[in-house]
Amino acid sequence: MKKKVIVGMSGGVDSSVAALLLKEQGYEVVGLFMKNWEDDDTDEYCPAKQDLIDAAAVADKIGIELEAVNFSKEYKERVFANFLEEYSAGRTPNPDILCNSEIKFKAFLDHAMALGGDLMATGHYAQVREKNGLFQLMKADDGTKDQSYFLYRLNQAQLSKTLFPLGHLLKREIRDIARRAGLPTSEKKDSTGICFIGERPFQEFLSRYLPRAPGEIQTPEGKVVGQHHGLMYYTMGQRQGLGIGGSKDSNGEPWFVAGKDMQRNVLIVVQGHDHPLLLNDGLIADNLHWIAGEEPKTHWVYAAKTRYRQPDAPCEIDRLDSGTAEIRFGHKQWAITPGQSVVVYESNVCLGGGIITSAL
């Protein structure tokens, strides 16, 4: 009997090809379109209506059933509330990571199983491998598109039910497959930005949910060089949008955000990309999650990323205790950002990671 796979279909080319490949591999395939955001569903910023139309057109083309489900309540409670909480505390969260572990691979997975699915699948660029009774999350073959960073919070139960049909393909190959199959999404551009913000200005969006609290921009020595609009709008290493380019007595080098003093509501800035305050030897992380269900060895050489699309950086886990980890890098890392995730790898295997609380 054919295994039934419930495929998350977003209306984009990747999930379209994922569904097509699974159908060709002999699975019974059902597409499931998720709606995760409702507050201001304007076509300009959140094109969910068009995405559903596109997903339906693809499902019709390849001859599969498409269902739709609304997870906006779950998204608001499990992802968006944390997003606002983190920004209020001066950190820079990554809601896509929480969306994966709480919505796409929890709420979606539960719904997929309720629909009688044996497995679920998405168009993520990653791979799953079973080895010695454990499921491993592997990097995709296309290193420029690998999304394992966003999936590091998945667990054994989730991975055991998940297929990533695109993990061994390059992006250009996926476009070619879509064109050859005549899929309506073959030329559709990739979506960018946080899913619920879309293409809209970030400050405009955030100010609707959190109060603005303007304050001073200062150098580490305490010199006032400008005014900020609210600490929540800025992140470590930020260069654009500071409004202090022509500050008097400046040495002509660009300004970068180097810290936030939450108690005084002061934004700390420095000049020069390689200023010492922007270069870090390591970090402390909490909220740890290890995919295998057990901690990795300490004082062992791994690699880690502290942001998406960053090259892997050699590191050691110096300490693991009380739910926190201290990670030291072989060479200095630039603008490590509290609230972002550090994700640890051993070769192409994603081991897990945690949320950065501070840089060292």
Curated annotation (Swiss-Prot):
Name by which UniProt lists this protein: tRNA-specific 2-thiouridylase MnmA
UniProt cross-references to PANTHER family, sorted A to Z: MITOCHONDRIAL TRNA-SPECIFIC 2-THIOURIDYLASE 1, TRNA 5-METHYLAMINOMETHYL-2-THIOURIDYLATE -METHYLTRANSFERASE
GO CC list: cytoplasm
Signal sequence segment: none
Catalytic activity: S-sulfanyl-L-cysteinyl-[protein] + uridine(34) in tRNA + AH2 + ATP = 2-thiouridine(34) in tRNA + L-cysteinyl-[protein] + A + AMP + diphosphate + H(+)
GO molecular function terms listed in the Swiss-Prot or TrEMBL record: ATP binding; tRNA binding; tRNA-uridine 2-sulfurtransferase activity
Protein source organism: Methylobacillus flagellatus (strain ATCC 51484 / DSM 6875 / VKM B-1610 / KT)
Gene name tied to this protein: mnmA
EC number: 2.8.1.13
